[in-house]
Amino acid sequence: VVYTPAIPKDHSELNFFIDKHYELKKRSEVLGMITKSSYTIGIAGTHGKTTTSSMVAHILKSAGMNCTAFLGGITKNYGTNLLLGNSVGKKYTVVEADEYDRSFLALYPDLAVITSMDADHLDIYGDHSYMVESYRLYAQQVKQGGRLIYKSGLQLADLEVEKNTYSIHGDADFNGDN
């Protein structure tokens, strides 16, 4: 039985499975197992996860890539939060890497994207510095030969991983301009 931290510990159905000794796994743990066998793009951040992961999945699908995606919201163009690729050939998996409950620490992406690290879920982290430290741990879990891409200005420049920054202000490795 797969569950998320959004399910309260006193939820009757969750407790039924606990009482009957069913095997329970957190969603993040299952995602970690699923993504081991594919090229994984994990997108984290307090803002922009769903938009960014949906866009990346759509780009891969539109390019004809074998893409599976676990998204945080229902996309308008697909009408679902789960896109399934096939089991043939190179597989790409896009995962919305949720920072709540430190769930993203179950992932070891080939490409990690961090969009923001604003104070959020302080009921879990206690204060902003502990939350930032969890993001830093997530960034360091990029697989050997992988890469971290993050918004310029985030406290990640000192990490010893292959990395690039992005911005719309001209102060990054990749810059958006209109």
Tell me the role of every PLM-derived stretch.
Residues A63, D171-N178:
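Short, intrinsically disordered, charge-balanced linker/junction segments flanking boundaries
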Residues P5-T165:
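Phosphate-binding loop of NTP-binding sites
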